[in-house]
Amino acid sequence: MTGTSLAATYGPIAGADLEAELAQPRTADGDAQDAAVLERDGGAHALPFASGGAFGRAPRDDDDDRRGAGDASVRLTRVSKRYGERTVLADVDLAIERGGFVSIVGRSGCGKSTLLRLVAELETPSAGTLVKRGDGGGVLDTRIMYQDARLLPWKTVLQNVMLGLGRRAKDDARAVLDEVGLLARAHDWPAQLSGGQRQRVALARALVHRPQLLLLDEPLGALDALTRIEMHELIERLWREHRFTALLVTHDVQEAVSLADRILLIEAGRIAFDQPVPLERPRARASAAFAELEDRVLQRVLTGSDPAGATSAAASAGGAARGRAAQANGLRWAV
């Protein structure tokens, strides 16, 4: 099956050509050669679910009641993924509320990115059911952003954002570049941009389609600390303005607490920890409540046990939390 026929069947996903994605091994992001394939097949592709709305079986009317998910835009029911004899994900049950922001953390190799690729439908489950529903029950327009911006080096910033949209989309592309603070760089080349600016272009390229679901696969992992904070603020602002559903895979626990309403920990291919984030926005990183929640999640990742038990991490913001703040800020990476 060619990239053209795949696009006709499934529609586009930004930042990833389907033929290249399905053929490549599960390793690092693509480079300019992948970007050339992307341009060849008409730009960034979207990947909504198939017409039935689900992998494995048709969705049932009682799915919402059985899962207790309410208005879920994405639902996985007993989903497993195997590569040969190796099981990467096992019996995953997950419902993502429409308009929510969910972060997935865990050690390297635990299955985080595999779960994201299943939701993107770049891979299919070995067992179980994945259901995606857009507004009104229609197609859930999905875009994905990687750590590698995958910009075409021979096209300007504006042209990169317009990939696959045609000349009539110039006004939309300029508007979204203005939203990410790069309208003044519209006619620059990607090589003239910093790493953070390149990621802003990648974000603009995804958001120009006004997606209902944005998937973020460690998009800020290569950026310096200050640029990461600026990108956190930008992503949160755009999420609040456009109210898309967001699913973030990250190694950085502080990043997960900064952005998400809910944090999932994957261990040995299963969801081992599901933590709400009851902190007001914008998040106060220097607060005791933030530090306590960050420390709780981090310790759960590192030790495999919940130091706070069933008690909400943000319920108490006393002296113990202040004592752990320096530790939480100094050790943020769950790798």
Swiss-Prot record:
It comes from the Bacteria. One of its GO terms (molecular function) is ATP binding. Residues 74-293 form the ABC transporter domain. Residues 48-71 are annotated as: Disordered. Its main location: membrane. It is found in: Cell inner membrane. It is a peripheral membrane protein. InterPro entries: AAA+_ATPase, ABC_transporter-like_ATP-bd, ABC_transporter-like_CS, ABC_transporter_ATP-bind, P-loop_NTPase. Disulfide bonds: none annotated. Part of the ABC transporter complex SsuABC involved in aliphatic sulfonates import. Responsible for energy coupling to the transport system. PANTHER family: ALIPHATIC SULFONATES IMPORT ATP-BINDING PROTEIN SSUB, TAURINE IMPORT ATP-BINDING PROTEIN-RELATED. This is Aliphatic sulfonates import ATP-binding protein SsuB.
